[in-house]
């Protein structure tokens, strides 16, 4: 397996981009910088990376399960933020994997080049770089996304697709939930009543909680070397030799795991969108 280019960029790389200075592995064309949050525009207005737009996960997810919007709705949202398939999207958040969730949805939609600020907003602040306050800048909407959405449907699966994939020999279902969630001690969310986990799933060593997978990060919040996380997965017999479907509660932590596996060069990987939230409402089977 050949490792894919890492999606994570450091704060100084982004600062150089904003100052139009040369960078390693820079975007090949137009690029957009977006802060991703959930009901957090007030935090963005209080201080954000200069030039960043704000996009809320509620714009791309739908009730009642927080699954991704239908394709035409998603297309309209992305166009309104000036995004199209050939754009490079550089995303950051203030924790909780909102940026990873959005980045994965963008890949699914058809944007091939997504970058993630390693350590998010806090890494920008630690570096002592400038911030600006106020509302999001005026964005000129795009008229044509450039490809039909979803251009990569195999990356994000609904429940029926997940069940079909699991019927194929060798497919691994990997829970990116904490051990207390995986073992049925807690659901991990105040809006998910059921405890337990999907039968046959392997635990993805996701210690911590829904806001932070502690053993996937360094002490400063940046991402550990993917090879170190692969070694943790190996302990649970999770490798890229098999097709792998990641899931969590509603897709955010699973999206983070997806990007780790992608950086490792794992070829056949996907996220089950509905996760435990959906599965627990439609089946009686738990482990």
Language-model segment annotations:
Residues 1-287:
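Cytosolic catalytic domains that perform sulfur/thiol-centered chemistry
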């Amino acid at each position: 397996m050949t490792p894919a280019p890492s999606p994570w960029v450091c704060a100084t790389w982004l600062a150089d981009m904003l100052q139009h200075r040369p960078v390693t592995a820079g975007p090949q064309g137009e690029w957009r910088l977006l802060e991703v949050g959930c009901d957090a525009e007030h935090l963005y207005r209080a201080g954000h990376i200069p030039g960043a737009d704000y996009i809320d996960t509620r714009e791309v997810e739908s009730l009642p399960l927080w699954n991704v919007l239908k394709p035409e709705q998603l297309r309209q949202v992305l166009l309104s933020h000036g995004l199209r398939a050939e754009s490079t999207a550089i995303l950051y958040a203030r924790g909780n994997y909102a940026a990873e969730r959005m980045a994965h949805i963008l890949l699914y939609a058809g944007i091939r080049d997504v970058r993630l600020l390693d350590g998010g907003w806090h890494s920008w602040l630690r570096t002592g770089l400038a911030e600006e306050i106020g509302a999001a800048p005026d964005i000129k909407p795009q008229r044509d996304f450039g490809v039909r959405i979803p251009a990569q449907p195999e990356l994000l699966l609904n429940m029926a697709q997940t069940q079909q994939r699991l019927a194929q020999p060798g497919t691994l279902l990997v829970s990116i939930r904490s051990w207390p969630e995986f073992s049925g001690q807690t659901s991990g969310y105040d809006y998910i009543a059921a405890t337990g986990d999907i039968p046959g799933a392997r635990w993805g060593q996701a210690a911590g909680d829904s806001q932070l997978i502690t053993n996937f990060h360094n002490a400063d919040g940046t991402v550990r070397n993917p090879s170190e996380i692969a070694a943790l997965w190996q302990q649970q017999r999770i490798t890229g030799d098999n097709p792998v479907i990641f899931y969590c509660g509603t897709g955010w932590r699973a999206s983070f795991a997806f990007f780790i596996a992608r950086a490792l060069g794992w070829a056949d990987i996907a996220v089950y969108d509905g996760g435990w939230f959906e599965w627990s409402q439609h089946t009686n089977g738990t482990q």
